[in-house]
Every structure is written in structure tokens, then in C-alpha cells.
Swiss-Prot record:
GO terms for cellular component: EMC complex; endoplasmic reticulum. InterPro entries: TMEM85/Emc4. The chain crosses the membrane at residues 91-111, 137-157. It holds the Pfam family EMC4. Belongs to the EMC4 family. Signal peptide: none annotated. The lineage of its organism: Eukaryota, Fungi, Dikarya, Ascomycota, Taphrinomycotina. Keywords: Endoplasmic reticulum, Membrane, Transmembrane, Transmembrane helix. GO terms for biological process: protein insertion into ER membrane. It comes from Schizosaccharomyces pombe (strain 972 / ATCC 24843). This is ER membrane protein complex subunit 4.
């Protein structure tokens, strides 16, 4: 049979589809559990004793713990996401130059505004992970804010390198107090001949 020939191929596949799956046999009692693995022995004892309700609750608790751990892991992945952006943004800030051009100014504004938006929406960014253990999201949220502040630091450094931050005394001349002289001399000097 060639693949391009028009045949009723479903008749060829029907016997394979009609087979029922084999019965699943649990052979886990034949093998010893790994060292330090206690959950299996508790579950197998409950199943053999006929206490299926307690084994179901053990499975449900374990499943809930695994779900919370997975949510916490995903929360930390979200917290580390700004850290992965730091090298790219640092290279972009370096490559845009220090002269006052539209591209370098827009890059610098992006480095200041985007982390500020992310910091203000930290609570909404972490709402999918609220089902984790109580109090375990605070370190992840703190790390997220810290990494966003590092991104803002790159933007502030770029502003300073471009000369847009008032860091010298000549930038503050309007608030400088003029020097008060104790003595003044007026008039032309007299020369004696």
C-alpha cells in the first residue's frame, strides 16, 4: 500500500482501536521503597486495612501541598524575571550612548517608567499565587521589588551619565547665596607724582 493511494485506511486501524487496555496491576508491594520515603508505606497500610477514606485524605493533603509548592516555585520565577532583564537593559543603555538623542532619552525613560509601573502593580502580579502557604510570598515580592529597583538604578545612572541629573554646584546656582564682603573700595585710585 502506497501512502498516496486512496484506500479505506480506517478498516486497517479498527482492530488496533478495538483492543481494550490491559488491567493495571499494582506491583509496588513487591519492591522496597526508597530510603526516607514514608508516604508509600502509610498509603499501602491504609489500603490493605480497608481504610480508603484516610488514604484518600492523605493523597488529597499531599496533592494540596504539592500544589502550594508549585505555586510558590512559580512565584519565585516571577520574582526573578526582572533579574533576567538587567543584562539586556544594561547593554541597551550602554549601546544607546550618552549624548542627548531621542533614542537614548526614550531608553532611559523606559528604564525608569517600566519598573515603576511594575512596582505599583506588584500585588496584582502576585495574585495568582495567593493560595500558597501564608507568609511565604513576602520574600518573593520583596525580591521582585528589589530587582525592579535595580533596573531603575540603571536608568538613574544613565541619566547621570547623560548629564541630566543636577549633581554639580553649577546646577544649583539659583539657590547659592552671594558672598558678602566686609569692605569695599570705590573710585579711582589716586596716584602721586
Amino acid at each position: 500500500m502506497h501512502i498516496n493511494e486512496e484506500t479505506d485506511w480506517i478498516d486497517l486501524v479498527k482492530p488496533a482501536l478495538a483492543k481494550k487496555p490491559k488491567k493495571i496491576v499494582d506491583n509496588s508491594d513487591k519492591f522496597p521503597t526508597p530510603r526516607g520515603f514514608q508516604q508509600k508505606s502509610l498509603v499501602s497500610k491504609n489500603i490493605h486495612s480497608g481504610n480508603s477514606a484516610s488514604s484518600t485524605s492523605i493523597f488529597a493533603k499531599r496533592e494540596e501541598e504539592l500544589q502550594k509548592d508549585l505555586l510558590l516555585k512559580k512565584a519565585w520565577e516571577l520574582a526573578y524575571s526582572p533579574l533576567k532583564q538587567i543584562p539586556m537593559n544594561a547593554i541597551l543603555a550602554y549601546m544607546s550612548g550618552n549624548s542627548l538623542q531621542i533614542f537614548s532619552i526614550m531608553t532611559t525613560l523606559m528604564l525608569l517608567v517600566n519598573p515603576l509601573k511594575a512596582i505599583t502593580s506588584t500585588g496584582s502580579a502576585f495574585t495568582p499565587f495567593k493560595g500558597t502557604h501564608p507568609g511565604t510570598l513576602w520574600p518573593a515580592m520583596g525580591a521582585y521589588i528589589l530587582f525592579q529597583l535595580l533596573l531603575m538604578g540603571i536608568g538613574v545612572y544613565k541619566l547621570q551619565r547623560m548629564g541630566l541629573l543636577p549633581t554639580t554646584t553649577s546646577d544649583w546656582l539659583a539657590w547659592e547665596v552671594s558672598k558678602v564682603f566686609m569692605d569695599r573700595s570705590y573710585g579711582p585710585s589716586k596716584t602721586v607724582l
